[in-house]
Amino acid sequence: MTRLSHQDLRRNFRQLLASDTCYHTASVFDPMSARIAADLGFEVGILGGSVASLQVLGAPDFALITLSEFAEQATRIGRVAQLPVIADADHGYGNALNVMRTIVELERAGVAALTIEDTLLPAQFGRKSTDLITVAEGVGKIRAALEARVDSEMAIIARTNAGILPNQEIISRTKQYQAAGADGICMVGIQDFDQLEQIAEHLTVPLMLVTYGNPALRDDKRLAELGVRVTIDGHGAYFAAIKATYDSLREQRQIFTQASDLSATELTHTYTQPEEYILWAKEYMSVKE
């Protein structure tokens, strides 16, 4: 079987961005899931930062995973992946210089694209965990990412949260990220097509949405018309794997013979123990939710 190189996969992803179709990502978190996604015909995969934290650390999504840990997981996936994989690179693991290091490591890992978000991470003392950095800092990160990139086929996508600022501010941010050279804009927090249309009409680069399966956005034709080329609908495959593991091990121990009535979300909550992290953040950092 002919294997596609990392550059082949990056070119394939560029073709998706240049198309007039909206594609849905498969959540890939290890080599096996990447192979399964490709075998089932998914055109693109996503390695989520939250899923990587669960997979590598068994910890909730509190920006605890390091660049090295994330890049190692991306490398494992990149060795076998035969579909383009987008890496959710969070905030680039620091300032603009850290972003440059992030680009080097993830390009070497073989990802086809990556997102750099403008959330203030990790949570800062006395600040809300959803605060955004300034536009100027966000632009600096995108420019630094482009400078650090060697393979121009690897897409650099700027990500922002459209759910916590007025539309006009989101339009201003995304236009500046576009002007800085971002290959695409990723948005989380879009509520409906009215909001999406108001923002999208000001942008010319391909769009990517984190929808988490929002029913108000379930119209691929309309999404495509508005420039959306990729949607991230969540990481259901990963949580289903947690549920299946729990049920299988419990049955093996013969404690019960029927499947658990706990949901995957409840199981994830139980075994990542987020209450401890929330307590520590409040105690030592005065983080405000």
Curated annotation (Swiss-Prot):
A Pfam family assignment: PEP_mutase
Cofactor notes: Binds 1 Mg(2+) ion per subunit.
Superkingdom in the source lineage: Bacteria
Database matches in InterPro entries: ICL/PEPM, Oxaloacetate_deCOase_bac, Pyrv/PenolPyrv_kinase-like_dom, Pyrv_kinase-like_dom_sf
This enzyme's EC code(s): 4.1.1.112
Entry-linked CDD domains: ICL_PEPM (cd00377)
UniProt KW keywords: Decarboxylase, Lyase, Magnesium, Metal-binding
Cofactors demanded by this protein: Mg(2+)
Positions bound to substrate: 50, 159, 235
GO biological process: oxaloacetate metabolic process; propionate catabolic process, 2-methylcitrate cycle; pyruvate biosynthetic process
Family of this protein: Belongs to the isocitrate lyase/PEP mutase superfamily. Oxaloacetate decarboxylase family.
Assembly behavior: Homotetramer; dimer of dimers.
Known role: Catalyzes the decarboxylation of oxaloacetate into pyruvate. Seems to play a role in maintaining cellular concentrations of bicarbonate and pyruvate.
Annotated HAMAP family: OadC
Protein name, UniProt field: Oxaloacetate decarboxylase 1
